[in-house]
């Protein structure tokens, strides 16, 4: 799994059940940044190199105000680019494993705080949250998850069934 090494130490440091909040700059050492800038230039954008111009993505509409773009990974790991319109929410859920969310543009908030451009939220299977896009422009983020989402609340059984069926078509 790609999660075995990806920021795993940060999850082990959690004393209470709450997401870990980092800024992407916290994850990169100064010497690494300088070396990277020397090799590829200051305007290097790994997201653009991975998927191209974000404005040209063919988003898949999941429900009103929520779109995603899936990038293929092996095993049960998923990486998605998610775009939420202002005020759009994701139902209360957790994950059957780890989840990393990096905000690329705009912001979202949940029970644990507000996450803005450059912030990273790190969750484990004990975290339940209900993210809502709260910026006037909505929110664009990268979500990397280890396993399927588990929904809670009024429509949980329907949403979980949909997730189960969808897992056969990955």
Predicted regions and their residues:
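Positively biased amphipathic helices and basic secretion/translocation or surface-docking motifs
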Residues: 1-55
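Short histidine-centered beta-strand/loop micro-motifs
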Residues: 72, 81-82, 91-95, 112-113, ...
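Ligand-binding loop in jelly-roll beta-barrel domains
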Residues: 127-151
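Short acidic-glycine-tyrosine-enriched beta hairpin
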Residues: 110-130
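A short glycine-rich, His/Asp/Glu-containing loop-to-beta-strand
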Residues: 56-88
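Double-stranded beta-helix
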Residues: 142-170
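Conserved hydrophobic/aromatic beta-strand scaffold that supports enzyme active sites
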Residues: 68-70, 79-83, 100, 120-122, ...
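Glycine- and acidic-residue-biased ligand/ion/polar-headgroup-sensing regions
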Residues: 85-88, 95-110
């Amino acid at each position: 799994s790609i999660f075995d090494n990806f920021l795993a130490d940060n999850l082990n440091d959690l004393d209470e059940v709450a997401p870990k909040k980092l800024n992407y700059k916290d994850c990169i050492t100064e010497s690494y940044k300088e070396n990277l800038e020397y090799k590829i230039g200051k305007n290097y954008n790994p997201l653009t190199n991975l998927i191209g111009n974000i404005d040209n993505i063919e988003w898949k509409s999941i429900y009103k105000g929520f779109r995603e773009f899936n990038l293929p990974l092996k095993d049960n790991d998923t990486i998605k680019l998610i775009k939420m319109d202002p005020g759009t929410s994701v139902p209360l859920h957790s994950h059957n494993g780890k989840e990393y969310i990096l905000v690329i543009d705009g912001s979202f908030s949940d029970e644990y705080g507000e996450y803005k451009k450059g912030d990273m939220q790190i969750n484990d299977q004990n975290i339940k949250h209900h993210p809502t896009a709260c910026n006037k422009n909505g929110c664009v983020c990268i979500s990397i998850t280890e396993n399927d989402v588990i929904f809670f609340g009024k429509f949980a059984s329907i949403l979980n069934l949909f997730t189960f069926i969808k897992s056969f078509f990955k």
